[in-house]
Amino acid sequence: MFLWERPRYLPDIRLELLADIVTFKSSFTGKTQKVTYATPNWKGTLTVSNISESQLLELKSFVDQVYKDGNIFLIKTYGHLVTANEPIALGPTGNDDFLKTVGWEPNRDIARAGDKISVNDELKVVTAPVRSDGVGSAVISISPRLRKPIAAGDTMKIITQSPKGRFHIRDIYKIKQKVDAMQKGDNIVINFFEDF
């Protein structure tokens, strides 16, 4: 699976959490209703204006690799102060918007609200400050909630340094055609969506 790391020439992908809103229309009355689901989804955006030759080569290489790898890739994030360690999440929590974790250094600040972590290639945002207790355990509130709950007796490794999320490009074939036809000076916006 291809791993998107900090690019050499291209701007980095902007990640944001979007509410999962679906609009339904009644076939009987014609009225519409919007439903917001409890779990938001990650969306990434890569915007390149007035593309240079170096950026174009890097973009073509990226799109070709994602296309070849079945349109699933990982995005690595940076710049967070989460304590380096190899903690694990214990299951089940009974509620998938927090993690019971062990393996931290005791009595340490672990993360701030807004830091990112990943659990089994699911990218999460820490929603409240986290501090470990005297035995190195901590409860981490996260968003979005876990897509795949932790089963009883199972554990999941938590990645705190350069966490990753699993994404795909909608309509990769059309994006690949567009990128292949691009020339120096062109503009493009590519959207990526969480894959789960």
Task: Tell what function each PLM region has.
Residues 1-196:
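Extracellular/virion structural assembly segments
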